[in-house]
Amino acid sequence: DTRTLDLYNNHTKERLTITFKKNGRYIPSALAELNRFLRDWRRNESITMDPRLFDTVWELHQRSGSRQPIHVVCGYRSLATNNLLRSRSSAVAKHSQHTLGKAMDLNIPDVSVDKLRAIGVQMQNGGVGWYPSANSPFVHIDVGNVRAWPRLSRTQLVSLFPDGKTAHIPADGKPLPGY
């Protein structure tokens, strides 16, 4: 099992294609490069990112069927940057997973954010945020608790989980039968 990510940073215009895992083992030098690539570009600060995020993003990309690079909108975000963004938008969480190195905002040019959201929700690896009307539409993927925002309707969740087995709660607040 070899896992390679092909990334493009929307802000720095950098591109990185890197194998970060081989035979079930993370490659330390690759993780260090990913930490630098996903740095807070406003402050040029990096953090040790949670490698489970790379596995989750890799799986999302695989399931999407795309061969296009993943466009990174945001990786690590320092507390100072997070506070700056919070002062401009109510959509920025006070205790953001970005500040912990556990989140990535992304899009893939030839995959709709609706499809990326559906795949992310089905994976149940963490949080999935959906921002279809941002300047550049994107999804937020993190390896925190399993949740999605905005919440999906009961009909949407049933279409993704026909057996009802999901940790996601529909917008009506009533869990599906397999919860």
PLM feature spans:
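Catalytic cores and adjacent binding grooves of peptidoglycan-active enzymes
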Residues: R3-Y8, A91-Y179
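Mature N-terminal segment immediately following signal peptide/propeptide cleavage
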Residues: T4-H11, R15-K21
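Loop/turn elements at helix/coil->beta-strand transitions in domains of secreted/extracellular proteins
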Residues: E14, S66-I70, Q124-V128
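Active-site acidic/histidine clusters and adjacent loop/turn architecture
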Residues: K22-V73
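Cysteine-centered nucleophilic/redox motifs
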Residues: T56-H61, S78-T81, L106
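Acidic helix-start/capping segments at beta-turn-to-alpha-helix junctions
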Residues: P69-L84
